Amino acid sequence: MKFYMTPGSCSTGIHILLEEAGLVFEAHVLNLIKGDHLKPDYLAINPNGTIPTLLRDDGVALTDFVSIATWIAEAFPRRKLLPEEPAPRETAFATMAFCVGHIHGEGFRRIFVPERYGSKGADIDAIKVEGRAIVASALLAIDCELKGNDYAAGGFSIADAALFYNEFWADKIGMVLPPSCLAHYQLMRSRPAVRQVLAEEGYR
């Protein structure tokens, strides 16, 4: 398998899942600033020009966080990256979708690429503030769901990898994580696979 990623991005969550599952893969680092994701050879694999991408051994390219995480969990069930019981399993999927689609998609995108959310001459700072408010509110909602539990859906699952990269971003931009999210973030950072991934990606 070939894994296309950028250190410190949402692909960090997938990187964690690949390591947690003990899978063998070939990592390809894309420099987004240099436009590696827009080069013809990459667009031939992922026409959307986004990361992460996982090119499976059968030639199928998975080109978004949710599809990659779901495939890893379902293709390698012995790794127990999804709960077996219906209720916590649904919680894992719902939490992952909320983290990727709302916290990242609606919140952090406004913080990182505010120019995409307004016409020319728009108040960029106001858009960033709006993004921070979305992230803060969403993390409070997650905090209520965690209620002091170690992980989002019982044991470690794909939901925790999605939540972690958002917590990681919040930490990096100086946002204060609510108590249960902070405990989750610290617990995640203590996991061997997470420590390995952060070290490989140049973070401590």
Regions found by a protein language model. Give the residues of each.
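GST-like domain detector, emphasizing the conserved glutathione-binding G-site
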Residues: M1-A126
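Positions that flank functional sites
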Residues: L32-I33, Y185, Y203
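Structured helix-beta-strand junction loops
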Residues: N48, A75, G148-N149, R191
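Active-site-flanking alpha-helical
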Residues: A73, N166-E167, L198
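GST-like fold's C-terminal all-alpha helical module
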Residues: C99-S190
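Terminal-tail/helix-coil boundary detector
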Residues: V197-R204
